[in-house]
Structures are given as structure tokens and as C-alpha cells.
Amino acid sequence: MKWWCTANVALTCFAVAFNSAVITADLAGVSETFGVSEEVSLLTITVFVIGFGVGPMAFAPLSEICGRRPIYASTLLVAVVFIIPCAVAQNIGTLIVCRLIDGIAFAAPMTLVGGTLADLWRNEERGVPMACFSAAPFIGPAIGPLVGGFTGDALGWRWLYWLQLILSGFCYVLITFTVPETYAPTILARRASKLRKQTGDSKYVTEMDLDKRPLGERLRVFLVRPFQLLFMEPIVLFISIYMSVLYSLLYMFFVAYPVVYQEGKGWTASSTGLMFIPLAVGVIMSAMCSPFVNRHYLQMVAKHDGKPPAEARLVPMMWSCWFIPVGLL
């Protein structure tokens, strides 16, 4: 069951990343349909990624109050619904606004997957599951332009959104109907509530039940905490900056490749999409290394009596990060 849940949340993460990039394959079609410049069409990507940055600050804290599953189900439903106006949009404004809403809503799965895996797996077991999750946000943007190129050439840009609807709807069904709640405090609170109803004994309580703070105060604490971690914990700040650089490079390719290969060399969108295959292959190769990396981590666990330093997880990144500037050359 743990691997089933892991596979479903990783697939959802892939779908979200795929949705962010698939439309890059036919931005020219959007510009032609609505009579706007390509820079304006690019806003459909920009606002989606901005939503990625806004959503986590609310959804991650809320999941600690409501549980993971309600946040997954509600945000994915909103995201799926707002793909439809994108597919049938009659003006660029509708497209941009709905993409922003989708970006905010789709941020929830991207944010909660790490917490879900932490709920499911012990610290020493998380290496391979986390590798599956970490690979998904990078494979999705690599596969998106590839699939989108052929779809856009054959069916037009609107089908890029119908494709998102199909994939996201499938993920919504899987997450909503097959993935149970994983957040331990929420599970315990529900179990205690059930026991109180069955026995009439009020002694069955959890830590959440004993927290008598008003909901507003709890929300304030949970909503402020991400900003405190970001700006007051150097490791969180620097990892966030590092990941921002990686994602900025990735999304820069979405804009640069069409300029280089379509405008510069006269290639079609489908042929240009093939240039993203090496990126996907690289991510898959990296994920395949995770069992070996996890083996080293297990040795560190044994060496430190089950309590290895958190920085032990950073060793593979310290070596692999140098491949990025080399690859850009």
C-alpha cells in the first residue's frame, strides 16, 4: 500500500509538471488565435509558475490542520475544473487568469508529496521513494514539450489543454478514491473521535484535541512558519535558492529551444520537442542512482547509531551539482 500511495503521488507530481510545460509546444498558435505577441502568450507559463510559488505557503500549513487528503482532493478538483476554461478560452485574459488559478491549485500536490512520503516511510527508507518524487517534477517538463509538439502539430493548441484535463482528471480519481489519509495526527484524531462516539468515554483524546487555541491563532502560526523557516534557517534558504536556479534554467529552455530550433533552424514543434529527450534521460539516470546513494546513507545510519546528521543527504548533491555548469557549456 505504501508503494501504491508513493506511485500515485509521484504520478500526480509528474502530471503537474507536465501541465506546466506542455503548452510551450504551441505558443505560436495562441498568439495567432488571439492576435497577441508571443511575449503575452508566454504569460500563460509565467503565471502558472508564480502560482507554484504562492500556493505552498497556504496549502502546506493547512494540511497540518485538515490532513493531507482533503487538501489533495479539493485543490486537484479546482485545478481540473479550471483547465476547461483554458481549453475553450475566447480571449487571452481568460487563459491567463485560469492558468494562474491552476498554478496555485496544482501547487498543493507538489508541496504535499514530500510530507506524504515522510508520513509513509521511515527516515532510512525514504531514499528511493524520494528519488521517485524528485524525478517527477523534472521528467514532466521534459516530456511535456515532446508530447505537446506532436499534439499541437496534429490537433492544435487547444488539445494541449484537453490533454492536461485527461491526465489531471485521472490523477484526481486515483488520489481521491485510492489514497488514504497519511498524516498521523489527523488519523489519530479521527480514531479518537470514533472511540468517543462508540464508548461515550471522553478520555479518548489526542494532542490535536488538547490544543485549545482558536483556529485563527493556529492558522496564523502555521501560515507564518514557512516564512520563518525560509528566512531564518540558512539551509532552507540556500536549498530554496539552489532549486530556484535549477527550475529557472529548466523553464528557460522552454523558451530558448523554440527560438533556436524553430525560428533559427526552421524545425517543427514536434521535432523541437525531441530535444528534451536527453533531459528526461538524464533525470531517469539520476533516479536510478538512488538505491546506491541510499545504501551509503544506511551505512551512515549504522555509523551514527540510527541518528545520522541531516547533512548526510547532501553528499550526492555536492558531487552532482557540478554537472549542471558542465552541461550548460
Feature locations, PLM:
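A six-helix transmembrane bundle that forms the core substrate pathway of small-molecule transporters
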Residues: 1-329
